[in-house]
Amino acid sequence: MKKRALVVCPGRGTYNAAELGYLQRHHAARSDLIATVDAARVATGQVPISQLDSATKYTPSVHMTGDNASPLIYACAMADFAAIDRDRFDIVAVTGNSMGWYLALACAGILDLAGGARLVNNMGGLMHQQGAGGQIVWPIVDDDWQIQENNILFVRNLLAEAKAVSTIKIYVSIRLGGMIVLAADEAGLKWLMERLPKDDRFPLRLMHHAAFHSPLLNHIVPIARAENQASDFGRGDIPAMTGRGVSGRPARSVAQRFMTIRLARN
């Protein structure tokens, strides 16, 4: 009897130095999949992900930027997904946070492999070229992963204080389990780093990240809609669940499908 499984797709920040060579170590036999993602890169004059993955040294200024990290993560995740034994596991739904939502669309079949590669590459490039601000992660749990109400209250008070400062812009970016991710402009990031309580790891600024999921990136929305065609989106064959529990279901027309995906991601 098959086990039922929910697949959670990774987002940005999941291809680090330890992952260099991941495709060759774990998925060398999936050359067709890698070639499909490479083709999306070659079409836009970018370095193929196979070349980035096979580099002799991990270079943060190359491997961590959105235009390169995004398609690298996409290729690794899609190869992992393809490796799941469907005779053992019945995948009942897929989900993902942030960039992981794009990957979830591809895993669900709403985007095919090439369409997903184009979407991820387009969005990674846009964020790299036109992104603004950044993100900071701070925990709202203790060492035993127990929610600390005083930490939640501290963040609320900090955000209220920030609203009264006209020279900074700070927003809640993601409520990520036991972490709060804050998005801000450069002045806001500096302000947060000076005020958030520190330990040996946090507050942590996410390098090469823009102020994702905040009004600071509203200017990218019309560009993204123009660069990503509705015709790439299909019916899919696995439910795609958003972080709010909304399920991406087949719609009657291409336009309705594309709008459903837009609304679900928002």
Mark where each language-model region is.
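Short glycine-rich phosphate-binding loop at a beta-alpha junction
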Residues: 6-8, 91-96, 181
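Gly/Ala-rich beta-loop-alpha elbow adjacent to hydrolase catalytic centers
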Residues: 77, 92-100, 104, 108
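Alpha/beta catalytic cores of group-transfer enzymes, especially the acyltransferase/condensing modules
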Residues: 108-257
